[in-house]
């Protein structure tokens, strides 16, 4: 589970409230399924979705959430827009500035194929409108629960169907007067004047309505007793236990409602939350048994900081930012009313949770959201390890074949299984009386069937390698068998290279050299025997050997490692990428132990070594001449203040087989890159050095763009590219295209064949129905998968002065998915994006510094 996927919903602080609960505030709203029994917080204690002023722990019970217009606690729809960053992209209309695709952005080449997708139309009754009201209180009432309770005393006026976030009220009807005044009374007898002012009548397609639909849908999921974790909803009452790995899976769904080409539609996909059946305290205890006592606290911090935990008392997720060893469950904190309470007593009263270990430290989670517009950050959340479950998988689990195999049985769904699970959710919506009543009250309904439409399958590519041309089976998108034994396009001789190994791996080292001698002749690589260097199995010994033996004549260093210990790998890569710039190849010895795969592994190692020294493997036909292709991706370096590293990779020849690579560091909190101008200028110089002329087109594939950052990209990064191109020289005015690449999409596509659903073939393009009318965008399914459902990639052309037709952009994009030299097949994104990802990952994970620029013309990071 990646960091960007973890959206934690922690609410705003609320103090003690004296409310006479009347109307909807007094009881459960009609139509809701009663929540499971849960200890309700006592009045005056911490309530709400997350934290109290200053100190914090806790969240409101489900019944309380439903009292306050369920769903609107998570997202305010004030004029400034909602909190979910992806909605900020709604107002970015880039297509209107692209004259050549204003009329049509669809291509026509390829074979027509029938597809269906996990989208369902949302329909509304004729002349439907949403009425938005602003609510004022005199005197001012700060607490949202109190404001809601006072307003809902007048349910006879506003009606049973309403949505209120504390300031903005939405109704499916228009009140008689534009301004309506009513009076309410608090529990202590204070009279409050409430002014209800109509501010907007919203059509179904307005951005505010789109946000509203999503909130209403989340309300429906709560009615069905699904539990929100981050942005998604899960069913804790239907867990899947994997006891032999101490894991639990909660099945659930991702959902979003957006305006697509012709309809407003719900996109929903299956999601799975992987939890561990051990608490953080269990984890700490097990670690204590394996660690020296004086290193225990350091080791715990190293293992836990950055992880996401789930609180067992209210199913909220938090990121562990620190561990406070000076506090324990007996420590006290100050509540909103000024009184002090210990964690022990607080959890006993608030959640009926008994803490047994009174010496455990306290976990600290820093908030990310401020209180209101321009508000201050609330205090940190203080969590008890005993009451928190670990989530996600450790690196050890991810590298355990059996763990991943057992997980895949439940999480890797075929198209038909995925359609069945999504269909179950839609069936529940149509069959649940409470859900249907809610939808009827708002005048909304959903289609019952998956959306069907036509896509296109692009022509498969021919692979050129060493003067020969190969076809491959498009169903598998892999040409490793077809090209085996064929010479490469460009090879680098292995004349002067080192092989560093430990004594216990002497046999593996000799075996590797013998097998390399067997596989390299067919590739056209001339190879001499390596300089063999035996070292102790310590990081310092490897570094000492590198310092003593690597010279300016050394072409590449191969390090045979006993294990995949990160510290040793990092030290080797850091030295050879920065202090002594030399291509390097690290090999874990056990991968050479299986006789049935040893030749295939030796082949892969030889190919990687050739690439890292500057060789070229294969190519496809690239009709677009004088075009430089750029790929950009970002990685967050958690060890360096969580700053970002952007990998920048650009082609420097017309065949797009040679690449220039740089990286840029960016301060914390910024994903967009300031230093791209320097990278692009350097790439243009590298192109000029190889070709003696400048490219007439620059096409940028921009990956690593987070939700809500599209506007910044359009307004800031694109002008930076344009300024850079202008600064190259008078009269130089190449055409620029910028395409945003997005892998994390919830859309899934299924090919219809003989009454069954299956994965679309590689090369399937979708540019109708489920694309966005305000964007020049399309999907491509480029890769093949052996199991489960294939994931498409979304491409959004945000700037384009090329004048190229949609067919040409789509075909170029698909071609570029064929030239990633670490895999003899089609990958999910264009090769420069994957190269940029590999570079940024290496720098962020291992090097933490800018690599030496003398390596920039080689794929040293593969």
Curated annotation (Swiss-Prot):
The modification Omega-N-methylarginine is found at residues 14, 49, 53, 371. Induction: Expression is activated by MYBL1/A-MYB. Keywords: Cytoplasm, Developmental protein, Differentiation, Endonuclease, Hydrolase, Magnesium, Meiosis, Metal-binding, Methylation, Nuclease, RNA-binding, RNA-mediated gene silencing, Spermatogenesis, Translation regulation, Ubl conjugation. CDD domains: PAZ_piwi_like, Piwi_piwi-like_Euk. Residues 1-48 are annotated as: Disordered. Changing residue 343 to A: Impairs binding to 2'-O-methylated 3'-end of piRNAs. Gene3D superfamilies: 3.40.50.2300, paz domain, Ribonuclease H-like superfamily/Ribonuclease H. It is found in: Cytoplasm. Residues 317-319 are annotated as: Required for binding 2'-O-methylated 3'-end of piRNAs. Transmembrane segments: none annotated. PROSITE patterns: PAZ, PIWI. The record marks 382 as: Required for binding 2'-O-methylated 3'-end of piRNAs. GO terms for cellular component: chromatoid body; cytoplasm; cytosol; dense body; nucleus; P granule. It comes from the Eukaryota. Changing residue 382 to A: Impairs binding to 2'-O-methylated 3'-end of piRNAs. This is Piwi-like protein 1.
């Amino acid at each position: 589970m990646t960091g960007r996927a973890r959206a934690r919903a922690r609410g705003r602080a609320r103090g003690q409230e004296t409310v006479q609960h009347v109307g909807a505030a007094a009881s459960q709203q009609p139509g809701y399924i009663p929540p499971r029994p849960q200890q309700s917080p006592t009045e005056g204690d911490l309530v709400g979705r997350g934290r109290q002023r200053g100190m914090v722990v806790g969240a409101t019970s489900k019944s309380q959430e439903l009292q306050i217009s369920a769903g609107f606690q998570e997202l305010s729809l004030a004029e400034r827009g909602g909190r979910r960053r992806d909605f900020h992209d709604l107002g970015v209309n880039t297509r209107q500035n692209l004259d050549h695709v204003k009329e049509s952005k669809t291509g026509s080449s390829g074979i027509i194929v029938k597809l269906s997708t996990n989208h369902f139309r949302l329909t509304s009754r004729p002349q439907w409108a949403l009425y938005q009201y602003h609510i004022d209180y005199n005197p001012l009432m700060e607490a949202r629960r109190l404001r809601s309770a006072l307003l809902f005393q007048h349910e006879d006026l506003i009606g049973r169907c309403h949505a209120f976030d504390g300031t903005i009220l939405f109704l499916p009807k228009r009140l008689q007067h534009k301004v309506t005044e009513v009076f309410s009374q608090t529990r202590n007898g204070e009279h409050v004047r409430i002014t209800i002012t109509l501010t907007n009548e919203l059509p179904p397609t307005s951005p505010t309505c789109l946000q509203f639909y999503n909130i209403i849908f989340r309300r429906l999921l709560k009615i069905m007793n699904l539990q929100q974790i981050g942005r998604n909803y899960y069913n804790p009452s239907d867990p899947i236990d994997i006891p032999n790995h101490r894991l639990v899976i909660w099945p659930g769904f991702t959902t979003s409602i957006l305006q697509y080409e012709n309809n407003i539609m719900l996109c929903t996909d299956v999601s799975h939350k992987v939890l561990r059946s051990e608490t953080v305290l269990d984890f700490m205890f097990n670690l204590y048994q394996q660690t020296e006592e004086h290193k225990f606290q350091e080791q715990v911090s190293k293992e836990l900081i950055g992880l996401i935990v789930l609180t067992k008392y209210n199913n909220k997720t938090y990121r562990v930012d620190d561990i406070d060893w000076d506090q324990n469950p007996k420590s006290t904190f100050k509540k909103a009313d000024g009184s002090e309470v210990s964690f022990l007593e607080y959890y006993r009263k608030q959640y009926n949770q008994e803490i047994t270990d009174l010496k455990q430290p306290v976990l600290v989670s820093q908030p990310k959201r401020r209180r209101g517009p321009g508000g201050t950050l609330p205090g940190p959340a203080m969590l008890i390890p005993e009451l928190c479950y670990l989530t996600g998988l450790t690196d050890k689990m991810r590298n355990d074949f059996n763990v991943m195999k057992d997980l895949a049985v439940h999480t890797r769904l075929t198209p038909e299984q995925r359609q069945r699970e999504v269909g179950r959710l839609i069936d529940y919506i149509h069959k649940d009386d409470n859900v249907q009543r809610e939808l009827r009250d708002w005048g909304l309904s959903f289609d019952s069937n998956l959306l069907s439409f036509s896509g296109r399958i692009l022509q498969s590519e021919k692979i050129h390698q060493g003067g020969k041309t190969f076809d491959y089976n498009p169903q598998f998108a892999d040409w490793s068998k077809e090209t085996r034994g064929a010479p490469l396009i460009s090879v680098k001789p292995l004349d002067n290279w080192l092989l560093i190994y430990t004594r216990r791996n002497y046999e593996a080292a000799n075996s590797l050299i013998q097998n390399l001698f067997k596989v390299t002749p067919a590739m056209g690589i001339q190879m001499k025997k390596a300089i063999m260097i035996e070292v102790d199995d310590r990081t310092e010994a490897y570094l000492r050997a590198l310092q003593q033996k690597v010279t300016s004549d050394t072409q590449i260093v191969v390090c045979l490692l006993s294990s995949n210990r990160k510290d040793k790998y990092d030290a080797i890569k850091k030295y050879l990428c920065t202090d002594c710039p030399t291509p390097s190849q690290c090999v874990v010895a056990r991968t050479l132990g299986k006789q049935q795969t040893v030749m295939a592994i030796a082949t892969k190692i030889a190919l990687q070594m050739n690439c890292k020294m500057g060789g070229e493997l294969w190519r496809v036909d690239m009709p677009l001449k004088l075009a430089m292709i750029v790929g950009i991706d970002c990685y967050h370096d958690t060890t360096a203040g969580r700053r970002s590293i952007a990998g920048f990779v650009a082609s420097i020849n017309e065949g797009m087989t040679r690449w220039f690579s740089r990286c840029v560091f960016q301060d914390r909190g910024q994903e967009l890159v300031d230093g791209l101008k320097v990278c692009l200028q350097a790439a243009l110089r590298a192109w000029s050095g190889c070709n003696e002329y400048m490219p007439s087109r620059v096409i940028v594939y921009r990956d690593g763009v987070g939700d809500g950052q599209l506007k910044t990209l359009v307004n800031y990064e694109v002008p930076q590219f344009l300024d850079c191109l202008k600064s190259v020289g008078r009269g130089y005015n190449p055409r620029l295209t910028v395409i945003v690449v997005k892998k994390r999409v919830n859309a899934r596509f299924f090919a219809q064949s003989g009454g069954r659903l299956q994965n679309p073939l590689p090369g399937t393009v979708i540019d109708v129905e489920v694309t966005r009318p305000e964007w020049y965008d399309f999907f491509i399914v480029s890769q093949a998968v052996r199991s489960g459902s294939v994931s498409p990639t979304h491409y959004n052309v945000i700037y384009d002065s090329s004048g190229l037709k949609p067919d040409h952009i789509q075909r170029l994009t698909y071609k570029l998915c064929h030239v990633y030299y670490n895999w003899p097949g089609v990958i999910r994104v264009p090769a420069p994006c994957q190269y940029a990802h590999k570079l940024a990952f290496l720098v962020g994970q291992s090097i933490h510094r800018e690599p030496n620029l003398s390596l920039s013309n080689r794929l040293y990071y593969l």
